[in-house]
């Protein structure tokens, strides 16, 4: 499990989510991302000043174009690499920690979306990763 997250109880109860079709993060894997939209730049800033956690999740066909429906399952990633470019973009790498079921979406005042994740079904993800490394 990524640094500091040895069990699901170590993970935050609320997470920002980055709905991005075609980008899949799995526990123990890495996902490089180029962040350029202002709302997601803000999300990364907030993540870097806190838990360094971002939930990657796919979208489904429904919902508004600017607020698409979220898939049921995503994966929490920890920002393990971070760089700023001269033109204002961020280059980050997320390392997958644990899958989650997207619970209640919070009605909040941030430009990005946040959910209350349910890690229960995937509580063994951190242990599975550790076992593979041994």
Functional labels for PLM-detected ranges:
Residues 1-134:
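N-terminal low-complexity, acidic/polar interaction/targeting segments
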